[in-house]
Amino acid sequence: MTNQHSAPLTYRDAGVDIDAGDALVDRIKPLAARTMRPGVLVGIGGFGALFEVPKKFREPVLVSGTDGVGTKLRLAFDWNRHDTVGIDLVAMSVNDILVQGAEPLYFLDYFACGKLSVDTAAAVVGGIARGCELAGCALIGGETAEMPGMYPDGEYDLAGFAVGAVDKSAIIDGKSIQPGDVVLGLASSGAHSNGYSLVRKILERAGARPDQDFHGQPLVDVVMAPTRIYVKQVLAALDRHGPAIKGLAHITGGGLLDNVPRILQPGMAAQLQRDGWEMPKLFQWLQQQGSVADAEMHRVFNCGIGMVLVVAADQADAVAATLREQGEIVNRIGEIVPQQDGMAQTVVV
């Protein structure tokens, strides 16, 4: 006689739905197909993805980066906004490898959850595919992990991995930066994917609702605006101006104060002008609602500057003009100076 303890069990009984996983793959394949580019030999579906480095690179150096979206995901869950965090995921990695002069070639993602919702996962991957299109890289693989008991229902985690290439002679390392060079800032779309633990704390203090009006837009649209992807615009500037662009910094966790020093040699400092750009209304509101000090704002948030370029002074106007042609909002936000005793490597004055 069979009892409940000897009845046949299935993977579905344990909480893993193979059919849902297969359905998701079917939804993903056409999304990934839109991102294909020359060089992809084997994409989604194989045990490993294959990519041939473009022949235009004479001495190719591969540049890799990996990242997540951080606690911005908490708001995605709470506010049911899943279609843009995939763009964030791509942006965080491709912008990171861009700063060394690399052209992103391909991207892979990791999506982990406790119970797979095909619709939610497809919305996330749709954002990833859109991010890859914006960056010009191929979505050639990924992993979807349904792990019962590991995540609450409706929640998930994301990680992404980007690989790009740059000619060895064209690697940007900041070593040629010198006093007198100009610091240009490219506008961000908002908080991007950093500082969201503080953002959430301020939203809680303010009693904010996702549907409340914020200067003519729903607050959710402003707070969840996807991270800007600067790849095509900056690559166009590098192609035209080459060595005039001496350093690039992606302004992520640590804000301006911690990220700009990462491209400076000892003895160099970036002196940024507080009035060199207008801090967007979102950051003004966050600072006011949270009573956040200026220094804390500059070391947590991008404060409206998502990418920094250090360029030769005599080429600054030309580089800025090229970036504006590509649709960028460009501000001249400071200059490189000799670092004085006791001076931080990046200061806002």
UniProtKB/Swiss-Prot annotation:
InterPro entries: PurM-like_C_dom (IPR010918), PurM-like_C_sf (IPR036676), PurM-like_N (IPR016188), PurM-like_N_sf (IPR036921), PurM_cligase (IPR004733). The keyword Lyase does not apply. Its EC number is 6.3.3.1. Gene3D superfamilies: PurM-like C-terminal domain, PurM-like, N-terminal domain. GO terms for biological process: 'de novo' IMP biosynthetic process; adenine biosynthetic process. Keywords: ATP-binding, Cytoplasm, Ligase, Nucleotide-binding, Purine biosynthesis. GO terms for molecular function: ATP binding; phosphoribosylamine-glycine ligase activity; phosphoribosylformylglycinamidine cyclo-ligase activity. Pfam families: AIRS, AIRS_C. It catalyses: 2-formamido-N(1)-(5-O-phospho-beta-D-ribosyl)acetamidine + ATP = 5-amino-1-(5-phospho-beta-D-ribosyl)imidazole + ADP + phosphate + H(+). It is found in: Cytoplasm. Its main location: cytoplasm. Pathway: Purine metabolism; IMP biosynthesis via de novo pathway; 5-amino-1-(5-phospho-D-ribosyl)imidazole from N(2)-formyl-N(1)-(5-phospho-D-ribosyl)glycinamide: step 2/2. GO terms for cellular component: cytosol. It is an enzyme of class 6 (ligase). Belongs to the AIR synthase family. PANTHER family: TRIFUNCTIONAL PURINE BIOSYNTHETIC PROTEIN ADENOSINE-3, TRIFUNCTIONAL PURINE BIOSYNTHETIC PROTEIN ADENOSINE-3-RELATED. This is Phosphoribosylformylglycinamidine cyclo-ligase.
